[in-house]
From Swiss-Prot:
Full protein name: Probable E3 ubiquitin ligase complex SCF subunit sconB
InterPro entries: F-box-like_dom_sf (IPR036047), F-box_dom (IPR001810), G-protein_beta_WD-40_rep (IPR020472), SCF_subunit_WD-repeat (IPR051075), WD40/YVTN_repeat-like_dom_sf (IPR015943), WD40_repeat_CS (IPR019775), WD40_repeat_dom_sf (IPR036322), WD40_rpt (IPR001680)
Cited CDD domains: F-box_SpPof1-like, WD40
Pathway noted in the entry: Protein modification; protein ubiquitination
Family note: Belongs to the WD repeat MET30/SCONB/SCON-2 family.
Tree of life domain: Eukaryota
UniProt keyword annotations, A-Z: Repeat, Transcription, Transcription regulation, Ubl conjugation pathway, WD repeat
GO biological process: one example: protein ubiquitination
Organism name: Aspergillus clavatus (strain ATCC 1007 / CBS 513.65 / DSM 816 / NCTC 3887 / NRRL 1 / QM 1276 / 107)
Quaternary structure annotation from Swiss-Prot or TrEMBL: Component of the SCF(sconB) E3 ubiquitin ligase complex.
Function text: Component of the SCF(sconB) E3 ubiquitin ligase complex involved in the regulation of sulfur metabolite repression, probably by mediating the inactivation or degradation of the metR transcription factor.
Record region (Disordered): 282-313, 556-598
Length: 700
């Protein structure tokens, strides 16, 4: 037998002696076809034909032998069982022979990431991989036929081996490698161990991972591959991103983006109602499908309260398009196809607007037409309403700048107004309030009852509150036609704000105080002291606004909060606790709020003629922050969850960060004191005694 065989005993078995003896061995001719050696590069399941020469690995108790060359017939007998055992679907297609024990292949049925059949079927070789395979094939062709067959044979054995055997083979190979070879392995493995984990993981886990990324990282992830782009651009990921940033400041990055267009919100709700009327989707309410649009609107002198809690939470409740594909396939025709905007597009649109706010990039429109100072304004969608000391109200088209109509009827200057889809209510120094159909210019009704001029009003649902020079606040109930008078201020009442959710009213007065009233008991439940000038505006912040306690910096030495009509401060400075009241009282607003009644808005913002703006916490009565920057008294104020906008006697308009107190930007342009401000998500408008209205647009 012309085959050479080397045997080493395990007690003396050192790799060193093995290497020395291997140098004298001769290769035997292997009759493996050339195409078989080439094909073995591309598939781990390719194996050598049974007729080919093979190597026999035998483990004995104290010795092992390595066969370098043997007859083809003997090699086939030794290797074929090994191949049939580990890849039976190719070498034993009809099953095992009768009487042969069948070992469990459980350990061999678990695939690693690179060899998972489902991934291998989907995986496409990229250009670097194809180039590498072609280089290996060309390099293999340069070798002698005998060497090609030997290398291909070694690859086939390794490919057919299970994980445990492969590990042993690799350990033996690396134990015999020199440093240049180990360095080559290290450099090659560095790229090979990089796995496409997003493709390997279930989509739910991939979405969870991507939700931790910021917008820049998400955009970079979308450039990796088509699969990554599909995952990174999915509505599940960007809906979460919008939840974190739109209409609120993100706690991680500090960015906050404005809400969406209220007009688009209403259109989307109408589409949903039409679809709901056409086929039954009883499990989904229309409030849960408010769509991608959300409000971007204005206020008169201050940020108006959202029309409903559903609209305010529409952003969170909107279903993602990827979650409700059923709606797109239920009916034929474009009429029944959902028209949701992708959340990434929504975020992109809002991000552009937020960036314009941050850097002051805006367009300016000037509205001229009044003949006396403008004292109040409000805008909604493309409608702007302004009231002036010339006793007129003008309705404007904000898109074209055209004056649509003029409402006449008051006998004196108009100090306040507010409108919705159906009506406009105005207050005048002639002591009356008028209700108008602003679309036609018709005066529907006139309300009288104050003994002085009406200089402030606010309505919400069926409740109207008016503030007057006669030092009182009057409540008008449109539903039951009842009225009541709230007395307590000792000077002009300049502003009022109704919160129907908690059934409370805030008022600001020239007596330098702010009061909180209970509409159920018709009593004052809180008085805030702190300003040293006449308080002109009070704005409750939206309930989504969050303020970190450690950001509070206002000194409370000159601030006092009283409960009820008592002029004394509450014990320990805790509002809602009179001198004889126990601290165990559950609600800081009194026993009327103990039975599940919603509490008033947690934060309010006020401005006064002492040139300052203050941020208050209503539950504790603390002044959390004082904003300094205006040179003269602050007449106008507007606020939302992202910013505060103020206008003052110094003819300047300032934008503030309510959390830090920093003045982010100052706008000039008016030639008279700024008397009123309307704030939207993508724009704001200012009115002045110079008879002009200036609208600043930050749209993308």
């Amino acid at each position: 037998m012309d085959t050479q065989r080397l045997s080493l005993r395990k007690e003396n078995g050192s790799a060193h002696s093995l290497l020395q003896d291997q140098t004298g061995l001769k290769e035997n001719t292997m009759n493996i076809p050339r195409d078989s050696s080439f094909n073995s590069i591309f598939g781990p399941s390719e194996v050598v034909d049974d007729a080919g020469t093979d190597r026999d690995f035998k483990h004995e108790s104290h010795k092992f032998s390595i066969t370098r060359a043997m007859p083809e017939k003997l090699a086939g007998k030794n290797i074929a069982p090994f191949l049939a055992k580990h890849i039976p679907e190719q070498y034993a297609p009809l099953g095992s022979h009768a009487g042969e024990p069948v070992e469990s292949s459980g350990a061999n049925s678990r695939y690693c990431y690179r060899h998972r059949p489902d991934l291998k079927c989907r995986r496409q070789a990229d250009e670097p991989t194809m180039d590498k395979l072609q280089r290996i094939a060309k390099e293999l062709e340069t070798l002698p036929q005998r060497d090609q067959q030997g290398i291909a044979h070694a690859w086939s054995i390794f490919s057919a081996a299970p994980a445990k055997h492969r590990k042993l083979l690799l350990q033996g190979i690396m134990a015999q490698c020199c440093f240049p070879q180990l360095s080559f392995i290290s450099a090659s493995v560095r790229d090979l161990i990089r796995i496409d984990f997003l493709t390997a993981l279930p989509p739910e886990i991939s979405f969870k991972i991507l939700c931790y990324l910021d917008t820049t990282s998400l955009c970079k992830a979308a450039q990796v591959s088509r699969r990554w782009r599909a995952l990174a651009d999915d509505d599940v990921v960007w809906h979460r991103m919008c939840e974190q940033h739109i209409h609120r400041k993100c706690k991680k990055c500090g960015w906050g983006l404005p809400l969406l267009d209220r007009k688009r919100l209403r259109e989307s709700k109408r589409q949903i109602e039409l679809r709901a009327a056409t086929w039954d989707i009883s499990e989904q309410s229309t409030e849960d499908e408010t769509g991608s649009p959300a409000p971007e609107s204005a206020s008169s002198n201050a940020k108006r309260k959202p029309e409903s809690d559903d609209e305010d939470t529409a952003l969170v409740k909107r279903h993602c398009t990827s979650i409700v594909p059923r709606l797109e396939k239920e009916k034929d025709g474009d009429y029944f196809i959902t028209r949701y905007r992708p959340w990434k597009e929504v975020y992109k649109d809002r991000f552009k607007v937020g960036t314009n706010w941050k850097y002051g990039r805006c367009s300016v429109k000037v509205f001229k037409g009044h003949t006396n100072g403008i004292m109040c304004l409000q805008f909604e969608d493309n409608i702007l309403a302004t009231g002036s000391y010339d006793a007129t109200i003008k309705i404007w088209d904000t898109e074209t700048g055209e004056e649509l109509r003029t409402l006449r009827g008051h006998e004196s200057g108009i100090r306040c107004l507010q409108f919705d889809d159906t009506k406009l209510i105005s207050g005048s120094m002639d002591r009356s309030l008028k209700v108008w159909n602003w679309r036609t210019g018709e005066c529907i009704s006139t309300y009288t009852g104050h003994r002085g001029g009406v200089i402030g009003l606010h309505f919400d649902a069926t409740i109207l509150a008016s503030a007057s020079v006669d030092k009182t606040v009057k409540i008008w109930n449109f539903e039951d036609k009842s009225t009541c008078l709230l007395r307590g201020h000792t000077d002009w009442v300049n502003a009022v704000r109704v919160d129907t959710n908690s059934r409370t009213v805030f008022s600001a007065s020239d007596d330098c105080t702010i009061r909180l009233w209970d509409l159920d008991t018709k009593t004052c439940i809180r008085t805030f002291h702190g300003h040293v000038g006449q308080v002109q505006q009070v704005i409750p912040l939206p309930r989504e606004f969050e303020f970190e306690d450690h950001d509070a910096e206002c000194e409370n030495d000159n601030v006092s909060v009283t409960s009820g009509d008592s002029p004394a401060a509450s014990p320990r400075g805790i509002p809602g606790l009179d001198a004889g009241t126990s601290e165990t009282q559950s609600s800081p607003f009194g026993p009327a709020f103990d039975n599940g009644r919603p509490a008033p808005p947690r934060y309010i913002v006020t401005s006064a003629l002492d040139s300052t703006i203050r941020l208050w916490e209503t539950s504790t009565g603390r002044c959390l922050r004082t904003f300094f920057g205006h040179l003269e008294g602050v007449w106008a104020l507007a606020a939302d969850t992202l910013r505060i906008v103020s206008g003052a006697e110094d003819r300047m308009v300032k934008i503030w960060d309510p959390r830090t107190g920093k003045c982010e930007r100052t706008f000039t342009g008016h030639s008279g004191p700024v008397t009123c401000i309307g704030l939207g998500d993508s724009r704001f408008a200012t009115g002045s005694e110079d008879c002009e209205v200036r609208m600043y647009g930050f749209q993308s």
